[in-house]
From Swiss-Prot:
Family membership noted in the UniProt record: Belongs to the glycosyl hydrolase 76 family.
Catalysed reactions listed for this entry: Random hydrolysis of (1->6)-alpha-D-mannosidic linkages in unbranched (1->6)-mannans
Region (Disordered) location: 399-418
Free-text function comment from the UniProt entry: Required for normal synthesis of the cell wall.
Signal among keywords: yes
Sites of GPI-anchor amidated glycine lipidation: 437
Bilayer topology annotation: Lipid-anchor; GPI-anchor
Record-given protein name: Mannan endo-1,6-alpha-mannosidase DFG5
PANTHER family assigned to the protein according to its UniProt record, in alphabetical order: MANNAN ENDO-1,6-ALPHA-MANNOSIDASE DCW1, MANNAN ENDO-1,6-ALPHA-MANNOSIDASE DFG5
Localization per record: Cell membrane
Length: 458
């Protein structure tokens, strides 16, 4: 039988084959080469910015397109800022600077007017962690009379800690800041973990031990309430409603909760010169993370990934988890061998997932598949970026401190107006089980903030 194949059909077949060849060979990663790593992450960042509004006509600087929320932007910029430092690549330096500054809010506390009605404690906390990265990496401080990045993180800390609620569940932050938002009666781990980590990092950076005391208070509460269970492979659960005194805990585990707690513990270990208490807790949390979130040493979101149920939020979680693993390996060097192996294996698999899309370097969700699994989006790009760039975490200086290379300008009173009490003006001596002093301060501050919130309703 003679088959007639037209020239047009032959060309079509050739183009299809070439496209397939390009896509399946798009990202060859050499995990020992900075050039290879940074070339790969440059492609991935380009894919992230396909979703960015800030460079479009009429778009909002510092925001990504729907369905991505404000906190996703904070998480994404945290990864891009690390790439700026680790790869020494200033391609997006101006974009990052403009984005971080555009979303500060008029009080420079990361409560911008465009988020006033919907922002939660976790949202503000994620941005606070990102800006703390700017502090520790000596990202160019704002000029023109604006506060430094350090002052902005201190404002985030002061405003978050002012919401500490001792009346329900013995302490802790609620998920939401404002009463009208769904979830106001839920106290979640991520909000409190963000406060814990920010306090730990501020304590290490500034040398002010009051921050460390607050960090210890927050971590003790997470353990006391049962959100963090310090068995040999520790659990970090999601949260609970105050209606049950936080006893009916949502026992779902996510990479970002583990990661943010892990990072906070690593900073506490470092800031206290390797105190055994923090080493023990850190070891248990790391054991839990390794047990729950790695399959064949490849990172995965165990609560949803195998079931195909990961939502937009959950598809971003591995990004901040990867960042925290990298920072932990620096802040607590005894964890380095374990973490480096996990990052290397996961980075290799993540790179292989970045062979999708028409560009040939769109990343996927399930790295175990060793190729793109059909998922794509900002979260997939963010996660691949962070795990791959953390191959370089030991090739650059450790996060700076105020007395060791840090340059950002601070203000311990940032975020607090004249009618509120700054927690750092009181040399708190917070012990486990002794919350009275903090409760009094919190009550004073909450009365002012509540008055402001009531005014906003009219």
């Amino acid at each position: 039988m003679i088959v007639n194949i037209s020239a047009k059909m032959i060309l079509s077949i050739c183009f299809t084959f070439l496209s397939f060849f390009k896509a399946t060979h798009a990202m060859d990663l050499d995990t020992t080469s900075k050039t290879s790593i940074c070339d790969a992450t440059a492609l991935i960042q380009g894919g992230m910015l396909d979703y960015y509004e800030g460079t479009r006509y009429g778009g909002t600087v510092g925001m990504f397109q729907s369905p991505y929320y404000w906190w996703h932007a904070g998480e994404a910029f945290g990864g891009m800022l690390e790439n700026w430092f680790l790869c020494e690549n200033d391609t997006y330096q101006e974009l990052l600077y403009d984005a971080l500054l555009a979303q500060t809010g008029s009080n420079y506390d990361y409560i911008p007017s465009n988020q006033t009605m919907v922002e939660g404690n976790d949202d503000q906390g994620i941005w606070g962690i990102t800006v703390m990265g700017a502090v520790e990496r000596n990202f160019t401080d704002p000029g023109d009379g604006k506060p430094g990045w350090l002052a902005m993180v201190q404002a985030v800390f002061n405003t978050m800690y002012s919401r500490w609620d001792s009346e329900h569940c013995g302490g802790g932050l609620r998920w939401q800041i404002f009463t009208w938002n769904s979830g106001y009666n839920y106290k979640n781990t991520v909000s409190n973990a963000c406060l814990f980590q920010i306090a730990a990092r501020l304590g290490r950076y500034t040398g002010n031990t009051t921050y460390l005391e607050v960090a210890e208070q927050v971590f003790d509460w997470l353990v006391d309430v049962g959100y963090v269970v310090l068995n040999d492979t520790a659990n970090v659960f999601d949260g609970a409603e105050i209606d049950t005194n936080c006893t009916d805990i949502t026992k779902i585990e996510w990479t970002y909760n583990h990661g943010i707690v892990l990072g906070g513990l690593a900073y506490m270990y470092n800031a206290t010169n390797g105190t055994g208490e923090w080493e023990t807790s850190l070891t248990k949390i790391l054991n839990g993370a390794k047990s729950y979130f790695f399959k064949d040493s490849i990172m995965y979101e165990s609560a949803c990934q195998d079931y195909g149920t990961c939502n937009t939020d959950q598809r971003t979680f591995k990004s901040i988890f990867s960042r925290m693993l990298g920072l932990t390996s620096v802040m607590a060097p005894f964890t380095r061998d374990t973490i480096d192996d996990l990052i290397k294996t996961s980075a290799e698999a993540a790179a292989k997932s970045c062979n999708g899309g028409t560009d040939g370097h769109t990343c996927g969700l399930n790295w175990q598949k060793q190729t793109n699994d059909g998922y794509y989006g900002l979260g997939e790009q963010m996660s691949a970026l962070e795990v791959i760039q953390n191959l370089l975490i030991h090739d650059r200086p450790a996060p700076y401190k105020e007395d060791n290379g840090g340059t950002s300008k601070g203000d311990a009173n940032a975020g607090m107006n004249s009618s509120t009490t700054n927690v750092l003006q009181n040399n708190l001596n917070i012990k486990k089980g002794d919350r009275a002093g903090a409760a009094i301060i919190t009550a004073v501050i909450l009365s002012v903030l509540t008055g402001g919130a009531v005014w906003m309703l009219f």
